Curated annotation (Swiss-Prot):
Pathway: Bacterial outer membrane biogenesis; lipopolysaccharide biosynthesis. Its main location: membrane. It comes from Escherichia coli. This is UDP-Glc:alpha-D-GlcNAc-diphosphoundecaprenol beta-1,3-glucosyltransferase WfaP. The gene is wfaP. One of its GO terms (biological process) is lipopolysaccharide biosynthetic process. GO terms for cellular component: plasma membrane. Its cofactor is Mn(2+); Mg(2+).
Length: 251
Protein backbone atom coordinates (compact mmCIF):
# COMPACT_ATOMS: atom_id res chain seq x y z
CA UNK A 1 0.00 0.00 0.00
CA UNK A 2 1.62 3.22 -1.21
CA UNK A 3 1.85 6.27 1.05
CA UNK A 4 -0.56 9.12 0.25
CA UNK A 5 0.41 12.63 1.39
CA UNK A 6 -2.62 14.82 2.05
CA UNK A 7 -1.82 18.52 1.69
CA UNK A 8 -3.94 21.04 3.61
CA UNK A 9 -3.26 24.77 3.45
CA UNK A 10 -4.97 26.53 6.36
CA UNK A 11 -5.62 30.21 6.92
CA UNK A 12 -8.15 31.65 9.38
CA UNK A 13 -10.40 28.62 9.07
CA UNK A 14 -11.19 27.87 12.72
CA UNK A 15 -14.82 27.09 11.93
CA UNK A 16 -14.10 24.42 9.31
CA UNK A 17 -10.60 23.01 9.80
CA UNK A 18 -11.55 20.40 12.40
CA UNK A 19 -14.14 18.73 10.15
CA UNK A 20 -11.70 18.89 7.24
CA UNK A 21 -8.91 17.14 9.12
CA UNK A 22 -11.29 14.59 10.64
CA UNK A 23 -12.49 13.63 7.16
CA UNK A 24 -8.88 12.92 6.21
CA UNK A 25 -8.21 10.93 9.36
CA UNK A 26 -11.38 8.88 8.81
CA UNK A 27 -10.26 7.52 5.44
CA UNK A 28 -10.52 3.76 5.00
CA UNK A 29 -7.15 3.97 3.24
CA UNK A 30 -4.82 4.02 6.25
CA UNK A 31 -1.33 4.61 4.83
CA UNK A 32 -1.53 8.38 4.84
CA UNK A 33 0.28 11.41 6.18
CA UNK A 34 -1.59 14.68 6.64
CA UNK A 35 0.55 17.78 6.26
CA UNK A 36 -1.18 20.94 7.45
CA UNK A 37 0.51 24.26 6.75
CA UNK A 38 -0.95 27.15 8.74
CA UNK A 39 -0.33 30.25 6.66
CA UNK A 40 0.17 32.57 9.63
CA UNK A 41 -3.47 32.54 10.73
CA UNK A 42 -4.67 35.28 13.07
CA UNK A 43 -7.54 33.26 14.56
CA UNK A 44 -7.53 29.97 16.52
CA UNK A 45 -6.70 27.73 13.55
CA UNK A 46 -3.21 26.82 14.80
CA UNK A 47 -4.47 25.90 18.27
CA UNK A 48 -7.26 23.75 16.85
CA UNK A 49 -5.07 21.68 14.54
CA UNK A 50 -2.52 21.11 17.30
CA UNK A 51 -5.21 19.69 19.56
CA UNK A 52 -5.97 16.93 17.05
CA UNK A 53 -3.71 14.13 18.23
CA UNK A 54 -2.73 11.61 15.58
CA UNK A 55 0.74 10.41 14.59
CA UNK A 56 -0.15 10.80 10.91
CA UNK A 57 -0.53 14.58 11.23
CA UNK A 58 2.38 16.94 10.59
CA UNK A 59 1.74 20.60 11.45
CA UNK A 60 3.91 23.42 10.14
CA UNK A 61 3.40 27.17 10.34
CA UNK A 62 4.58 29.98 8.10
CA UNK A 63 6.07 33.01 9.85
CA UNK A 64 4.24 35.27 7.41
CA UNK A 65 1.34 34.84 5.02
CA UNK A 66 2.51 33.25 1.76
CA UNK A 67 -0.91 32.60 0.24
CA UNK A 68 -2.45 29.28 -0.75
CA UNK A 69 0.33 28.51 -3.24
CA UNK A 70 3.07 29.22 -0.72
CA UNK A 71 1.41 27.19 2.03
CA UNK A 72 0.85 24.19 -0.24
CA UNK A 73 4.39 24.38 -1.57
CA UNK A 74 5.80 24.40 1.97
CA UNK A 75 3.84 21.23 2.69
CA UNK A 76 4.89 19.64 -0.60
CA UNK A 77 8.56 20.10 0.28
CA UNK A 78 8.28 17.64 3.15
CA UNK A 79 5.71 15.27 1.62
CA UNK A 80 7.00 11.68 1.40
CA UNK A 81 4.13 9.98 -0.41
CA UNK A 82 4.09 8.62 -3.91
CA UNK A 83 0.61 10.06 -4.19
CA UNK A 84 -0.29 13.67 -3.42
CA UNK A 85 -3.87 14.56 -2.48
CA UNK A 86 -5.10 18.10 -1.90
CA UNK A 87 -7.79 19.09 0.56
CA UNK A 88 -8.86 22.70 1.08
CA UNK A 89 -9.36 23.77 4.67
CA UNK A 90 -13.10 24.28 4.27
CA UNK A 91 -13.85 21.13 2.25
CA UNK A 92 -14.16 17.51 3.36
CA UNK A 93 -14.28 13.96 1.97
CA UNK A 94 -16.36 10.82 2.21
CA UNK A 95 -14.48 8.04 4.03
CA UNK A 96 -13.73 5.98 0.90
CA UNK A 97 -12.36 8.88 -1.17
CA UNK A 98 -8.67 7.94 -1.08
CA UNK A 99 -9.18 4.19 -1.31
CA UNK A 100 -11.43 4.38 -4.35
CA UNK A 101 -9.32 6.96 -6.15
CA UNK A 102 -6.02 5.14 -5.64
CA UNK A 103 -7.63 1.92 -6.87
CA UNK A 104 -8.84 3.78 -9.96
CA UNK A 105 -5.39 5.26 -10.62
CA UNK A 106 -3.60 1.95 -10.21
CA UNK A 107 -6.11 0.02 -12.30
CA UNK A 108 -6.34 2.58 -15.11
CA UNK A 109 -2.65 3.64 -15.01
CA UNK A 110 -3.55 7.28 -14.37
CA UNK A 111 -1.12 9.93 -13.08
CA UNK A 112 -3.65 12.77 -12.62
CA UNK A 113 -7.14 12.02 -11.32
CA UNK A 114 -10.07 13.99 -9.98
CA UNK A 115 -13.70 13.36 -9.05
CA UNK A 116 -17.17 14.89 -8.88
CA UNK A 117 -18.31 16.81 -5.84
CA UNK A 118 -21.22 17.96 -3.74
CA UNK A 119 -21.91 21.69 -3.52
CA UNK A 120 -22.52 22.82 0.05
CA UNK A 121 -23.72 26.29 0.98
CA UNK A 122 -24.52 27.32 4.55
CA UNK A 123 -24.25 23.65 5.60
CA UNK A 124 -26.89 22.58 3.07
CA UNK A 125 -26.12 20.36 0.06
CA UNK A 126 -27.48 22.34 -2.89
CA UNK A 127 -26.40 20.05 -5.71
CA UNK A 128 -23.74 17.88 -7.30
CA UNK A 129 -21.23 18.93 -9.93
CA UNK A 130 -20.16 16.35 -12.50
CA UNK A 131 -16.81 17.09 -14.10
CA UNK A 132 -15.93 15.88 -17.62
CA UNK A 133 -14.70 12.26 -17.87
CA UNK A 134 -11.31 13.40 -19.21
CA UNK A 135 -9.53 16.74 -19.63
CA UNK A 136 -6.46 17.55 -21.75
CA UNK A 137 -4.45 20.75 -22.11
CA UNK A 138 -6.54 22.21 -24.93
CA UNK A 139 -9.77 21.73 -23.03
CA UNK A 140 -8.29 23.10 -19.82
CA UNK A 141 -7.43 26.37 -21.56
CA UNK A 142 -11.16 26.94 -22.03
CA UNK A 143 -12.51 25.87 -18.66
CA UNK A 144 -11.50 24.55 -15.27
CA UNK A 145 -13.96 22.01 -13.96
CA UNK A 146 -11.54 20.35 -11.55
CA UNK A 147 -11.91 21.18 -7.87
CA UNK A 148 -8.58 21.14 -6.04
CA UNK A 149 -9.94 19.04 -3.18
CA UNK A 150 -10.81 16.21 -5.58
CA UNK A 151 -7.33 15.85 -7.10
CA UNK A 152 -4.73 13.13 -6.51
CA UNK A 153 -1.42 13.13 -8.39
CA UNK A 154 1.04 10.26 -8.84
CA UNK A 155 4.58 11.58 -8.50
CA UNK A 156 6.01 8.76 -10.59
CA UNK A 157 4.38 10.45 -13.58
CA UNK A 158 3.94 14.03 -12.41
CA UNK A 159 7.33 15.43 -11.46
CA UNK A 160 8.30 18.53 -9.47
CA UNK A 161 4.83 19.47 -8.25
CA UNK A 162 4.78 23.15 -7.30
CA UNK A 163 2.02 25.75 -7.34
CA UNK A 164 2.75 28.95 -9.30
CA UNK A 165 2.50 32.16 -7.27
CA UNK A 166 -0.55 33.59 -8.99
CA UNK A 167 -4.26 33.85 -8.26
CA UNK A 168 -6.01 30.65 -9.35
CA UNK A 169 -2.81 28.78 -8.58
CA UNK A 170 -4.45 25.36 -8.74
CA UNK A 171 -5.70 26.00 -12.28
CA UNK A 172 -2.22 27.20 -13.26
CA UNK A 173 -0.71 23.98 -11.89
CA UNK A 174 -3.20 21.79 -13.76
CA UNK A 175 -2.30 23.61 -17.00
CA UNK A 176 1.40 23.09 -16.34
CA UNK A 177 0.91 19.35 -15.82
CA UNK A 178 -1.38 18.87 -18.82
CA UNK A 179 0.95 20.87 -21.09
CA UNK A 180 3.39 17.96 -20.79
CA UNK A 181 0.96 15.60 -22.53
CA UNK A 182 -0.59 14.08 -19.42
CA UNK A 183 -4.38 13.69 -19.40
CA UNK A 184 -6.53 14.11 -16.30
CA UNK A 185 -9.17 11.43 -15.67
CA UNK A 186 -12.37 11.51 -13.64
CA UNK A 187 -13.12 8.62 -11.27
CA UNK A 188 -16.81 9.37 -11.88
CA UNK A 189 -17.44 9.18 -8.13
CA UNK A 190 -18.98 11.89 -5.94
CA UNK A 191 -16.72 11.90 -2.90
CA UNK A 192 -15.93 15.50 -1.94
CA UNK A 193 -17.94 18.24 -0.27
CA UNK A 194 -17.08 21.63 -1.76
CA UNK A 195 -18.18 24.51 0.44
CA UNK A 196 -19.25 27.74 -1.23
CA UNK A 197 -19.23 30.91 0.88
CA UNK A 198 -21.09 34.11 0.13
CA UNK A 199 -18.66 36.64 -1.33
CA UNK A 200 -15.94 34.08 -2.03
CA UNK A 201 -13.72 34.82 -5.01
CA UNK A 202 -14.81 31.69 -6.86
CA UNK A 203 -18.43 32.80 -6.40
CA UNK A 204 -17.71 36.22 -7.96
CA UNK A 205 -17.85 35.52 -11.68
CA UNK A 206 -16.38 38.82 -12.87
CA UNK A 207 -13.31 38.47 -10.66
CA UNK A 208 -13.03 34.85 -11.72
CA UNK A 209 -12.90 35.88 -15.39
CA UNK A 210 -10.10 38.36 -14.68
CA UNK A 211 -8.13 35.74 -12.78
CA UNK A 212 -8.64 33.29 -15.63
CA UNK A 213 -7.26 35.83 -18.10
CA UNK A 214 -4.23 36.52 -15.90
CA UNK A 215 -3.33 32.83 -15.72
CA UNK A 216 -3.57 32.43 -19.49
CA UNK A 217 -1.42 35.52 -19.97
CA UNK A 218 1.17 34.22 -17.50
CA UNK A 219 1.72 31.06 -19.55
CA UNK A 220 2.17 32.98 -22.78
CA UNK A 221 -1.25 32.68 -24.40
CA UNK A 222 -1.52 35.51 -26.97
CA UNK A 223 -4.24 38.16 -26.64
CA UNK A 224 -6.41 36.94 -29.51
CA UNK A 225 -6.22 33.34 -28.27
CA UNK A 226 -7.02 34.49 -24.71
CA UNK A 227 -10.17 36.20 -25.95
CA UNK A 228 -11.31 32.98 -27.61
CA UNK A 229 -10.50 30.94 -24.50
CA UNK A 230 -12.29 33.43 -22.24
CA UNK A 231 -15.37 33.33 -24.48
CA UNK A 232 -15.51 29.55 -24.13
CA UNK A 233 -14.80 29.87 -20.41
CA UNK A 234 -17.77 32.22 -19.96
CA UNK A 235 -20.08 29.96 -21.98
CA UNK A 236 -18.91 26.87 -20.11
CA UNK A 237 -19.45 28.71 -16.84
CA UNK A 238 -23.04 29.42 -17.82
CA UNK A 239 -23.59 25.80 -18.83
CA UNK A 240 -21.93 24.62 -15.63
CA UNK A 241 -24.24 26.56 -13.36
CA UNK A 242 -27.40 26.04 -15.39
CA UNK A 243 -27.11 22.41 -16.42
CA UNK A 244 -24.18 20.61 -14.78
CA UNK A 245 -25.46 20.72 -11.20
CA UNK A 246 -27.78 17.89 -10.32
CA UNK A 247 -30.39 18.40 -7.65
CA UNK A 248 -29.22 16.76 -4.42
CA UNK A 249 -32.27 14.47 -4.41
CA UNK A 250 -31.00 12.90 -7.64
CA UNK A 251 -27.38 12.58 -6.48
Amino acid sequence: MELVSIIIAAYNCKDTIYATVESALSQTYKNIEIIICDDSSTDDTWDIINKIKDSRIICIKNNYCKGAAGARNCALKIAKGRYIAFLDSDDYWVTTKISNQIHFMETEKVFFSYSNYYIEKDFVITGVFSSPPEINYGAMLKYCNIACSTVILDRTGVKNISFPYIDKEDYALWLNILSKGIKARNTNLVDTYYRVHAGSVSANKFKELIRQSNVLKSIGIKAHHRIICLFYYAINGLIKHCFSYRDKRNA
